[in-house]
Amino acid sequence: SSDLGDGFSLTEEILPAIAGHDLLVLCNPNNPTGTVAPKKLMTKILEECNKQSCLLLVDECFMDFTDRRGTLTDCFRSTLLVPQTPNLIILKAFTKTFAMPGLRLGYCMTYNRELLHKMVLCGPCWNVSVPAMACGQAALQDKGFLRRTRSYLKVERQRLIDGITRLGGGVYGSKANYIFFRYPDKTLHQKLCD
């Protein structure tokens, strides 16, 4: 089959493994497959982390390249979760979303004030450069950028998936700006050059 489906996707099998741990780190979308964990599953993981007093750190740096439905960022913005989510930390990055890798501009979101205080104490006194700040502010001015980028990526991702499939490869269900695929033999390089 050309569609390798869930492959390495996150499942409920992770829930019992949370017990006894202080921190769970997840990438959503998954790296390297680009698959997005369903909101229902992420909510269950968050609830289990709450029960187990385990911090949940979710790297959503590539989420802006997906259709973004049901992300923990969306949940975080919901005032209903505020008192229940002191153990949730979400990482985001301008450097990925706005193609500014050399400028190192990212941020975290959490309601855990104690953790934020510790991060400020441990961080450098000058953690964002002036050029990075200026680029971040400029990036936020283009309100249609993310919509246009998602639309472009949706078409180009499918074109790439179709091409790999035509060459005999199998692709995992990526929703991100990258794909993960399996190819049956070692001739892919030559076929891509042809």
Which sequence ranges carry the predicted segments?
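Structural motif
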Residues: L23-C27, L57, Y107-M109
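Active-site pre-lysine segment of PLP-dependent enzymes
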Residues: G7-G20, P32-L56, E60-T97
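Alpha-helical scaffolding segments of alpha/beta enzyme cores, especially the outer helices
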Residues: K40, K44-E47, L80, E114, ...
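A short, flexible beta-alpha/helix-coil linker loop
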Residues: P29-P32, D142
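PLP-dependent aminotransferase class I/II
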Residues: N87-Y172
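Conserved C-terminal alpha-helix-loop-beta "cap" of PLP-dependent enzymes
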Residues: T165-G170, Y178-D194
